[in-house]
């Protein structure tokens, strides 16, 4: 766990990259985010979970939990090389068409057609296949119950010198594990509370998106549970334990 003091001149304002209320800093190759709710511990738990998965380490951002100017939060290493730019799906679509990808939803009669439009769009305009990326993202979100996977939390990386694109590592998982869920009731069981979770961006159902793309990766469940049992008790730890336990045979 880190503990750092950062001056205000290191604050960075980034438009259109997430729900957007966390204070962000950049210093010596690290991004820092202070908590609005309890995003830091959730980011840590979710990214640590992925170290027990079959995903390559370059395909997700690893977050550390700690203190920033006395407040809880998290940090992660800058994954962009010089000459590379992170551009969200929302911004890419708006640059090319003048319309937000999120509002295109109302033009389609089904989740499937909305997904197909999005996949085809990135293939056509960026020569980028995003299917594997989305398969991995929605496998993770199905397990961790991410409720903030809007199109500013999905992104591509542009090699500005060669004008080529690749998918970004998975980032921004802080609104997972019932964190920030406005329907959460402490008196209800985890099983009851997760019934109220609403997914993004193609459907309100995590299962529907998972079923469309299929399983993106596997997790060493027993090893992950062994690790979680060493973590301090919290709602988020308990939700993750529950989700791993009920999805042991995820296919």
Role assignments for model-derived ranges:
Residues 1-13, 22, 42, 124, ...:
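Regulatory N- and C-terminal appendages and interdomain linkers associated
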Residues 4, 12, 101-106, 199-200, ...:
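Hydrophobic transmembrane signal anchors and adjacent membrane-proximal interface regions, especially
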């Amino acid at each position: 766990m880190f503990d750092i003091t950062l001056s205000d001149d290191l604050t960075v304002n980034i438009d259109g990259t997430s729900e957007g209320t966390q204070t962000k800093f950049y210093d010596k190759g690290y991004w820092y985010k202070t908590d609005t709710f309890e995003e830091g511990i959730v980011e840590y738990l979710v990214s640590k979970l992925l170290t027990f998965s079959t995903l390559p380490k370059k395909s997700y951002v690893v977050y550390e939990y700690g203190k920033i100017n006395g407040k809880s939060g998290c940090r992660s290493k800058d994954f962009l090389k010089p000459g590379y730019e992170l551009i969200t799906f929302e911004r890419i679509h708006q640059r090319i068409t003048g319309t937000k990808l999120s509002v295109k939803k109302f033009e389609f009669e089904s989740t499937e057609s909305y997904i197909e439009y999005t996949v085809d769009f990135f293939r056509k305009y960026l020569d980028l296949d995003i299917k594997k990326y989305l398969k991995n993202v929605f496998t993770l979100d199905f397990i961790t119950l991410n409720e903030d996977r809007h199109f500013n939390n999905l992104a591509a990386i542009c090699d500005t010198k060669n004008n080529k694109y690749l998918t970004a590592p998975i980032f921004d998982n802080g609104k997972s594990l019932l964190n920030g869920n406005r329907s959460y009731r402490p008196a209800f069981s985890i099983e009851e509370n997760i019934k109220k979770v609403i997914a993004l961006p193609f459907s309100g159902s995590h299962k529907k998106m998972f079923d469309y793309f299929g399983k993106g990766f596997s997790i060493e469940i027993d090893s992950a549970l062994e690790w979680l049992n060493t973590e301090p008790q919290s709602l988020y730890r308990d939700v993750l334990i529950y989700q791993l336990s009920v999805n042991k045979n995820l296919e």
